[in-house]
Amino acid sequence: FATPIMAEAQIPPTTKINTGAEVSMVGFGCFNPGNPPGIIPGIEAATKIGYTHYDTAALYENEKEVGDVLRASGIPREKLFVTTKLFNDCHHSVEASFDRSLEALNLDYIDMFLMHWPQATVPGQKYVADDSISFVDTWKQLEKLLETRAGKVKAIGVSNFSVKTLTELLKHAKVVPAMNQIETHPYNQDRELVK
């Protein structure tokens, strides 16, 4: 997995989020659908070439594997930045979902807990929209999580929010999201959002 070119790569720049934490601007994405153990060699290689930011999610069903590899890496926990995400069918139960993720990762804390998508789905039916809860209500639960799980979650944020949804959220947020993790590439250029 690691090539000499990768091993000589420079460590990516970091940015400071609103909590004061430094986050690598390049993270190792752990999405590997249908094969949780299949991500292990990639994470092992990433730890050896200097990645410090690891991104997983409840949806990926590999939080256990991510945590296992990171603990075995020998990298001090404070040198790592671990992001995981609340899945769409857990918008009604943010705290319970967070606890499951923390237990699966088996780490002392999670650096960043994101709302994976603004649209909730019916529990157990990940593709059926649930309009009984708004992303604003879900965000309020995430804000509460910062209080009830102080020290166990360092920052909260969102993922896949558009300018419209982010603007709406900011009208109601007491805590500004520390991150809006988005997909961007030549075939998906949301220039207004990236600005």
In which residue ranges do the predicted regions lie?
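Glycine/small-residue-rich loop that forms an oxyanion/phosphate-binding "nest" at active or ligand-binding sites
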Residues: 91-139
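A short, structured active-site edge motif that brings together acidic residues
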Residues: 77-90, 112-118, 181-184
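Active-site mouth loops of central-metabolism enzymes
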Residues: 26-37, 85-93, 125-131
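Short, intrinsically disordered, charge-balanced linker/junction segments flanking boundaries
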Residues: 2-6, 192-195
